[in-house]
Amino acid sequence: MKAKEIRELTTAEIEQKIKALKEELFNLRFQLATGQLENTARIRQVRKDIARMKTIIRERELAANK
């Protein structure tokens, strides 16, 4: 997901997506440990998406404090 798409979402929607991505990341790591994961790049992609979403939430918090 791109930052532009994330910025169009509300903070609550972003937090829901973060929760879903964290669950997916947990499952991907589990698959990696058991040798079932085929697309290892997906782990990195999910981590980056979570980081993007957290960054945008933080930007909104800082903007609200000014």
UniProtKB/Swiss-Prot annotation:
Recorded GO molecular functions are:
structural constituent of ribosome
The Gene Ontology CC terms held by the record are: cytosolic large ribosomal subunit
Write out the entry's keywords from A to Z.
Answer: Ribonucleoprotein, Ribosomal protein
Q: Mind telling me which Gene3D superfamilies this protein's record contains?
A: 1.10.287.310
BP terms from Gene Ontology? translation
Q: Which domain of life is it from?
A: Bacteria
* A Pfam family it matches: Ribosomal_L29
Which HAMAP family does the entry link to? Ribosomal_uL29
Q: Which family does it belong to?
A: Belongs to the universal ribosomal protein uL29 family.
Q: Which NCBIfam families does UniProt cross-reference here? A: L29
Q: What is this protein called?
A: Large ribosomal subunit protein uL29
Q: What is the lineage of its organism?
A: Bacteria, Bacillati, Bacillota, Bacilli, Bacillales
